[in-house]
Each structure stands twice: as C-alpha cells, then as structure tokens.
C-alpha cells in the first residue's frame, strides 16, 4: 500500500490559487511556491495545539461549593516551529518565496488598488499534516509569523534576474534593483507561526454533528 505524503503543508483553497500565489510566471516572487501549491515544510515541524471548554464559575449564597456553567468550546490556536534551509539555489529561491508568502497572507486589500477588492481580509488557508486523522484540510488563518535572521550563520547570495537555469519550476526573473538582482537569504532559519481555525458559520451549523465527530467521521472535513 502506497504511503501518502504526511509532510506539513499550508495551501490556498483550490479556487483561489492565483489570488494568493499570484500569476504562475517567473516574474512573480512567489512563483517557486506553485510547484508545491503553497508552502511545503521540508523538515518535520514542532506543532502545538489543543482543545478548550469554557465555563463560567457561579457561586451560591451560603454554600460551600460553586458551580460551573458551560459557555463554549473551541480548538486552541495551532503553533508551528518550522525550519528551512538554503543549501542550493532552488532552496534559496523557495525560502525567499516562503518568507514573502507569509508577509502577504497576513495583510488585507487596502486603498484604491485594486478598488474592487478594498477591505478584503487576509485569506483562509488549508493546513494538512500527518495524514487523514490528524490535520486534514483544516481551514486556518495566519495570526502571527515570526523569524530571526541570526548573526552566526552564513547567508547565501542568489540572482533573482533571469534565474531559470537551475529549475524551470523554481527559477524567477524579477526586476533588478540596486544590487543587480542579487539578494541574500539565510542558509538556515527557524520560523514561528500561529494559526487559528476559521470555519464558515453556515457550513459549521449545517455540517457539524458531535456523534459523527466522536467517531472520527468529520476529521476529513477539517474539524479538530
């Protein structure tokens, strides 16, 4: 039996690839991400999450004990500590795209360009990790992205102008700046991400069933 890919991925919803990744052409800094339809985490990340039930504590007059009134339940945010390396030209271009991707998906459309999208919030992405019964098509938003450009590592220069000789699916051709199109990326970087689930209210109301969830039947629909 063939084993499916269990690596962690953050991807656009299938209908919104170009809205989030930009055009599939070398003039786009996110072009390397088209080869993986989003961000593929190359190394096993550390993932932390959980589930919470909120209760409102209530007390009674002249009583020795209190009472907790149930309020709501929710999945805790998903935090990811992930490593990336740049040991080749392709890896360096991919890492550059990853950094810019997370900068982009934490921003909204603003101003007059384009006017018809003004006010559109950051996108909902799809998170997959560890197969069918862990994180399977979980809809998430990116609430925080952090990384450190450390002083004690090497930085790799890459040419971003007409860089198509290494891999047709990775190479980019960006406008040359004052450095002639060269930029530097760290040979090793650790990133920190905070995700939160973002379900569609009407779909949640019509689809969620605790009995089915308990049996694991809703895990393939993104519920955790």
Regions picked out by a protein language model, each given a short descriptive name:
Residues 1-224:
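Compositionally biased, intrinsically disordered low-complexity segments enriched in polar/Pro/Gly
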């Amino acid at each position: 039996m063939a084993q499916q890919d269990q690596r962690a991925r953050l991807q656009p919803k299938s209908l919104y690839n170009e809205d989030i990744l930009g055009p599939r052409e070398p003039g786009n800094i996110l072009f390397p991400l088209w080869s993986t339809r989003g961000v593929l985490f190359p190394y096993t990340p550390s993932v932390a999450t959980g589930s919470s039930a909120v209760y409102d504590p209530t007390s009674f007059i002249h009583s020795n004990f209190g009472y907790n009134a149930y309020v709501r339940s929710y999945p805790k945010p998903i935090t990811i500590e992930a490593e990336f390396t740049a040991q080749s030209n392709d890896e360096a271009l991919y890492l550059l795209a990853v950094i810019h991707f997370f900068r982009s998906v934490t921003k909204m459309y603003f101003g007059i360009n384009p006017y018809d999208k003004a006010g559109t919030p950051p996108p909902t992405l799809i998170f997959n990790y560890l197969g069918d019964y862990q994180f399977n098509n979980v809809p998430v938003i990116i609430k925080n992205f952090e990384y450190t450009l450390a002083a004690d590592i090497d930085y790799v220069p890459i040419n971003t102008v007409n860089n198509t000789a290494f891999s047709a699916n990775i190479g980019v051709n960006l406008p040359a700046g004052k450095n002639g199109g060269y930029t530097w990326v760290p040979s090793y970087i650790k990133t920190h991400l905070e995700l939160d689930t973002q379900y569609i209210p009407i779909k949640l109301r019509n689809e969620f069933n605790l009995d089915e969830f308990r049996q694991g039947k809703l895990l393939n629909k993104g519920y955790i």
